């Protein structure tokens, strides 16, 4: 497995060829195959290798706006909003575990992209969902790109996340969530992006924000923190590219993935939304990796 430190200000832009096709799908109007699955908004643009984009907690598919033009010019890209987020269906309280999110993606692929596989790229919570899907249904997943995904955190970081999880239970998610976001930014992060993240979270249904965070890191079946995360990642057979911001995390995770095409990179001069703080560099890196698969 390769492991690199991307401590660069900017890398050269890809020389892109081809033109993105016109939008071919916008909203899935039918419930996917699994009972209880949500109607998901998604766009389906381009031709070539199938790539699916999953956003993070209290976000939406617009997070990938810096990547979509490049990706859609090279690949077939399905960018979706997870249940309760963006323009997708808001499901009732009690249906926001990682397994619920995975079931939606599984149902979407089997119902609308039968017999097809995807490189699944997820940010934050979306990175963990992508990994869980790869574990449950490797027949649907070619590889995973985890953009600072919710995996591989130390127990010490887990204790910090516990404060947020506890705060979400009784506090105002519109205050608790942005306070966590503040700890995840870099000097490179635009004030406009920070404000957008906060306002978007505050416009997400409160029960969605409250109930989605904790199960990523706590309780039976969590795979985001400590030895449970390591044990889970070691079971994955698909190529896995994890981009993170912490050297100690990268050092831990560099031996966890079995595929020789897997890699773990440390990215400096970026906050948690690496793909927004360093978009050109990220676009080059992910395209180069996907093209090796």
Question: What feature does the model see in each segment?
Answer:
Residues 44-91:
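Conserved HGGG/HGGXW glycine-rich cap/lid loop of the alpha/beta-hydrolase fold
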Residues 135, 143-172:
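Flexible "cap/lid" loop of the alpha/beta hydrolase fold
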Residues 127-138, 144:
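Short glycine-enriched nucleophile-adjacent loop
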Residues 1-12, 16-23:
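N-terminal secretory signal peptides
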Residues 155-157, 171-233:
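Conserved alpha/beta-hydrolase catalytic His-Asp/Glu region
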Residues 45, 79-121, 125, 129, ...:
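Active-site loop/oxyanion-hole signature of alpha/beta-hydrolase fold enzymes
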Residues 270-279, 283:
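Catalytic histidine-centered segment of alpha/beta-hydrolase-like enzymes
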């Amino acid at each position: 497995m390769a492991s690199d430190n991307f401590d660069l200000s900017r890398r050269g832009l890809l020389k892109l060829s081809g033109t993105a096709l016109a939008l071919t799908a916008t909203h899935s109007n039918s419930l996917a195959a699994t009972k209880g699955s949500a109607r998901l908004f998604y766009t389906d643009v381009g031709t070539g290798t199938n790539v699916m984009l999953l956003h993070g907690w209290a976000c939406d598919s617009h997070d990938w706006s810096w990547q979509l033009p490049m990706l859609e010019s090279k690949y077939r890209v399905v960018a979706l909003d997870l249940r309760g987020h963006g323009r997708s269906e808001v499901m009732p309280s009690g249906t926001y575990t990682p397994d619920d999110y995975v079931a939606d993606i599984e149902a979407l692929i089997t119902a609308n992209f039968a017999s097809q596989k995807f490189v699944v790229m997820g940010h934050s919570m979306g990175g963990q969902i992508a990994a869980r899907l790869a574990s449950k249904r490797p027949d649907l997943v070619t590889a995973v790109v985890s953009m600072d995904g919710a995996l591989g955190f130390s127990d010490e970081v887990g204790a910090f996340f516990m404060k947020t999880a506890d705060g979400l239970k009784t506090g105002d998610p519109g205050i608790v969530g942005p306070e966590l976001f503040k700890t995840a930014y870099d000097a490179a992060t635009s004030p406009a992006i920070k404000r957008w993240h906060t306002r978007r979270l505050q416009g997400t249904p409160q029960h969605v924000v409250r109930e989605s965070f904790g199960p990523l890191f706590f309780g039976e079946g969590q795979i985001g923190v400590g030895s449970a995360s390591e044990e889970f990642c070691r079971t994955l057979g698909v190529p896995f590219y994890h981009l993170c911001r912490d050297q100690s995390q990268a050092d831990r995770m560099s031996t966890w993935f079995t595929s020789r095409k897997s890699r773990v990179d440390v990215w400096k001069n970026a906050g948690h939304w690496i793909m927004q703080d360093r978009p050109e560099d990220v676009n080059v890196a992910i395209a180069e990796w996907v093209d090796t698969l």
